[in-house]
Design a protein with these regions (language model features):
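N-terminal Sec-pathway targeting helices
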Residues: 1-18
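Short, surface-exposed beta-strand/strand-loop-strand elements in extracellular ectodomains
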Residues: 128-143
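Extracellular Ig-like/FN3 beta-sandwich strand-entry sites
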Residues: 113-115, 163-165
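Glycan-recognition and processing domains
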Residues: 10, 18-113, 121-132, 171-187
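Extracellular carbohydrate recognition and processing domains
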Residues: 139-162
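Short, aromatic- and glycine-rich surface loops/edge beta-strands on solvent-exposed regions
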Residues: 164-172
């Protein structure tokens, strides 16, 4: 009788361990993490760690695309930490240069709006090797316009829903440019 009880307990313990092991594998494959964590650590879409909740965006907030400290070591505020792949990763004191054909920036707006504009300040723009082609700007794979020179450019995005991930993609086949600041503004 004691052998049967010992066997039954052993089978129960083994079953519990198997179930626990399967749960651990499931949690490893499908973690419940924030979108910032997923995009930075799991899919590697973000180049800078924005912190939890920092992809959220309030319209009209102008962010500069530089390092967190200037050349003298002074802290800077409103630094764009939502940049994805395709951007320079260090020594970004005068803005951030593109390093690939496609460069990404991500937003999660806090509120919905019918008329939103993307405002970009390009400080350097070189099209010598691009056959004169402009920078094409896409939001969620929809072309919203072109940037054809340095300076401030305002492009209409249109309707934006709250808590929806906006993927801004700058496509430049061979153009080199430096993005100094960026914002989403209401009309």
């Amino acid at each position: 009788m004691k052998k049967n009880i010992a066997r039954i307990l052993l089978y129960i313990i083994c079953a519990v361990l198997v179930v626990f092991y399967i749960m651990v594998l499931w949690w490893g494959k499908n973690p419940k993490v924030g979108i910032e964590y997923r995009m930075y650590y799991l899919t590697h879409e973000l180049t800078d760690w924005p912190g939890y909740g920092n992809l959220k965006y309030k319209y009209g907030t102008k962010e500069i695309c530089t390092e967190y400290k200037d050349r003298n070591g002074n802290e800077l505020h409103n630094v764009c930490s939502r940049k994805g792949q395709g951007w320079q990763k260090s020594k970004r004191y005068e803005g951030t240069k593109n390093t690939a054909k496609d460069s990404y920036i991500y937003y999660i707006p806090e509120e919905s709006s019918d008329e939103i504009y993307l405002v970009c300040d390009i400080t350097e723009y070189n099209t010598e090797s691009s056959d004169g082609k402009d920078i094409e700007v896409y939001v969620n794979d929809k072309l919203i316009g072109n940037i054809d020179n340095k300076g401030v450019t305002k492009l209409k995005i249109g309707n934006v829903s709250a808590d929806e991930l906006l993927t801004v993609r700058f496509h430049a086949d061979y153009a080199e440019y430096t993005l100094y600041s960026i914002s989403l503004d209401k009309a």
